[in-house]
Amino acid sequence: MRRVVFNQKGGVGKSSIACNLAAVSAAQGYRTLLIDLDAQANSSHYLSGLTGDALPTGMADYFKQVLTGGAAGKKARPPIHETPFENLHLITATAELADLQPKLEAKHKINKLRKLLDNLAEDYERIYLDTPPALNFFTVSALIAADRCLIPFDCDSFSRQALYSLLDEIEELQEDHNEGLTVEGIVVNQFQPRAALPLQMVNELLAEGLPVLPVHLMSSVRMRESHQVCMPLIHFDPRHKLTQQFVELHGYLES
């Protein structure tokens, strides 16, 4: 299973959702890998506790090998790092990814990530791909490489406006590059059940026939606190309601 967590809008919780679902997967015994493709490296920091120059090499190292071409490029494999959490491994992002993007685009390396995931298939049962908040080279590579796509969504008008174009972009990519990509659904994040607007917006999306998932992720300060200590919720506060929502969401997606 290769799941990409994607939304071209920033601030909707892509990294939090990718990392926490990956952590639940690993806690349930699946050999799990998270690949961070965002130069901001939020997922890398969350799962390793490291930032900036302290982050070990990862996807940037891999793509530099790819750009060399020849035998070295064909055998390229990124450094894979253990995390403090059993069964959960990480390929980090660093700021260097942003500098590599135009070179990778110029050399048409858009399918290299899919080949890498093919080579990792025997090592990992579950692979999660965290993407940048833009439809750029790394995001398209992830959508081509994945077989499932999860779309985080905040209940506000800006997110809703962006959602329609996002779904159109995914459909076009499916037709052109990856017919095997399945949109699993829209996961509502930062949900406030007592507020009228979020529930109204969810109902309107459902009425339009959009695939809104039945498990919503509540807004909670515990998420920000888990970021602060670099510990996914399943390890930081396993009994918290938001943690249990992640467990429920993971179970729904696995069913």
How would you name each of these model-derived features?
Residues M1-S255:
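P-loop NTP-binding core
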